[in-house]
Amino acid sequence: GGPKLRIGRFAGGSVQLLPGNRFVLTTDGGEGDAGRVSVNHAGLPGDVKPGDAVFLNDGLLRLEVVAVRGNEIETVVKVGGWLSDKKGLSVPAAEISTPSVTGKDWRDLDFLVTQPIDYVSLSFVRSEKDIALLRQGLKERGSELPIVAKIEKAQAVQRLEPVIDAADAVMVARGDLGVECPIADVPLLQKRIIRACLEAAKPVITATQMLESMVGNPRPTRAEASDVANAVLDGTDAVMLSAESATGRYPLEAVRVMREIILNTEEFARRERPRSQGPDRELAVGDAIGRSACLAADSVRATVIVSLTQSGATARYLARWRPRQPILGVTPVRRSWNQLSLVWGVQPVVTEAFDPNFDAACEHIVAHLREERHLSAGAKVVITAGLPFAAHGRTNTIRIETT
């Protein structure tokens, strides 16, 4: 959900806007034509002023506000082109007065909380207050669904750290971000957002136009392959396809190509990744345990790191240090098992409730690894957990076992 601004429909489905022509945005509704079109936000005339740039269709068309008269915004076309129904609209310089969670969003949420979904995402986040509002709405509906904050507005970038702290995961939504902010800033903003998410141990998704040419072509451009690889090297937890798999002609090929690029890049990164250096700040206990577990795994040449976790927090603390070893996120909670699929380097494993005796729980895990993962005798396994198991979110224990 979130406050996405859109134009309405045209009588003929689309129109061509020519540079220098006047074009009116109106809140009065009705079908549009070559001279006017409706918008879905009644307060927009009060939010904009003469001189503001208005971008349409992911920034491909640009208008400039000339005057505001009642419910109409008069503009002049600066960059023209074809414009079709329901395209997005953005005014980067304006403080848009739409609510962060719309009436439709709340109605959708009533249905979503009854479904077996794992995350809910909020578009056009402006500050941490937007996330708090959605979280309160979830709580009122009896849900603790984690929230993915889509970073695509300049206001969210300005309050990046508080937004990340308030969210459970983040998406670098480069489409609208590249309209709201200068396009030359987007690659650096991507790196900054990913780095901040790593610091906070929050999963981050990089999205939009990663393999855009594969909407119509069976192979990506070289630049797109580099884009995917660089997102992996930046430290993203996940990369996302949109039109490539939703409406493109080669959805399976797009997934296969992206997977191949990820695997090749991860193999390179695993070889080149330096050993973790000490942080220049005080760490929370769970974070310190995660870092220590990764260092211990390197020191004893462990084959795998195991995280015994109820909520998934223990596995996230491990993943933020990007260890060379795979992480097994072992949990008795099926929703945590699903949610951990988003986290870098974690292979989720669902199990029965943990034995309250930690020694017995470790023995069970080692036996599982020996039988199911085919670990050779003498292989080292680093295990992390929060004890007692009933106390969620308390990562405080490391153990090294030998298979």
Residue ranges and their predicted role:
Residues 1-403:
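Non-catalytic helical/linker scaffolds that mediate oligomerization, partner binding
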